[in-house]
Amino acid sequence: MKKLSFQQIILTLQNYWQDYGCAILQPYDAHVGAGTFHPATVLRCLGTKPWSVAYVQPSRRPGDSRYGMHPNRMQHYYQFQVILKPSPDNIQELYLKSLECLGIDLKIHDIRFVEDDWESPTLGAAGLGWEVWCNGMEVSQFTYMQQIGGIECRPVAGEITYGLERLALYIQGVDEVRELDWSGQVGEKALKYGEVDFEAEGQFSKYNLELADSEMLLRHFKDSEDQCERLIKANLPMPAYDECLKASHAFNQLNALGVISVTERASYVLRVRHLARICCTKWLEMNK
């Protein structure tokens, strides 16, 4: 079987979950640290209304900046997120079938579910979870979402997060993300991952670790915090959640710069968690 390109992996997963019955959503247009932060997960996992969606989410983690020199760690990467609410009884079987669609033979390869309960302190979210390893390399995270914004999820949603770069490294049999086949084309049309993203990776790493203005980021954090509180009072939880995301990203940038002490870090986490909680609480009040 021909090895899938990076974009073919995405298209295959989209088609698989669309055939299952998921709505295929688009990435959220905000700086987020993971696909979980998309409001399609944070807000829609709350309440009783069924919700089945899948989407790609570009994600940013300033603390993982490596100037494009690390084989598989970047400050910008892609996740494929699936949310099934309520979680079906056969969710693990559905996941394994999706791997087969990507050309991974389950009879040959060692697929293991390694217990790893998931928690996001800034979102006030947690759930029973497993890392999914393929021949010793983590390729996905599997979680029963039990709490978001400090609110219990009833019913529990099933969350599957595919690490697209790691999955592609395994499928294509290469050692470095920059060498991944992005497009599946040959000749002049051939395109590698590094040609798409790695110039930006180097520049954003320099910004994240050397040039970001900490005083400006502190102001941005406080401004977003204040704006979030104001929007909640105006019964506008969705734009308020955008401000929560801005505060979260500013915190991540400050953390990457190394200007926040351990004590201060705990305080900032609690402040972002408070914003997430009031957004979730208000959204749930308005969508019962």
UniProtKB/Swiss-Prot annotation:
It is an enzyme of class 6 (ligase). GO terms for biological process: glycyl-tRNA aminoacylation. It is found in: Cytoplasm. One of its GO terms (cellular component) is cytosol. GO terms for molecular function: ATP binding; glycine-tRNA ligase activity. It comes from the Bacteria. Keywords: Aminoacyl-tRNA synthetase, ATP-binding, Cytoplasm, Ligase, Nucleotide-binding, Protein biosynthesis. SUPFAM superfamilies: Class II aaRS and biotin synthetases. It catalyses: tRNA(Gly) + glycine + ATP = glycyl-tRNA(Gly) + AMP + diphosphate. Its EC number is 6.1.1.14. HAMAP family: Gly_tRNA_synth_alpha (MF_00254). Tetramer of two alpha and two beta subunits. Belongs to the class-II aminoacyl-tRNA synthetase family. This is Glycine--tRNA ligase alpha subunit. It comes from Rickettsia africae (strain ESF-5). The lineage of its organism: Bacteria, Pseudomonadati, Pseudomonadota, Alphaproteobacteria, Rickettsiales.
